């Protein structure tokens, strides 16, 4: 299981990596392949800053809502190459990170004692 504190750290790391991925992996072409991870990464950083867990600046969003956003983002990232039609250009980073995001959601401890 992943503690809530570890999940918080993972959120910030994944958010930054998603923003940088198109530039580091060579698909910063201005299309959906580039913008989907950038926007999802920025979203992760923003809602992580206001989630009710350690390492946030305001405790506004409950963990359950945060995990729902993570799951939705992971699923969108996973299917985005086919949904937005760029699978012929690049698909593996989106699929790998999408699956990892879903796995982190499933393995995160949800009880407050685990925080």
Task: List each model region and its residues.
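A low-complexity, Ser/Thr/Gly/Pro-enriched, surface-exposed linker/loop concept
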Residues: 33-66, 103, 107-112
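Juxtamembrane loop-transmembrane helix junctions in multi-pass integral membrane proteins
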Residues: 2-5, 28-32, 54-64, 85-88
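Hydrophobic alpha-helical membrane segments
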Residues: 65-80
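Membrane-water interface at the C-terminal end of transmembrane alpha helices
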Residues: 4, 84, 101-115
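Membrane-helix boundary connector in multi-pass membrane proteins
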Residues: 79-93
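Membrane-helix boundary elements
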Residues: 12-32
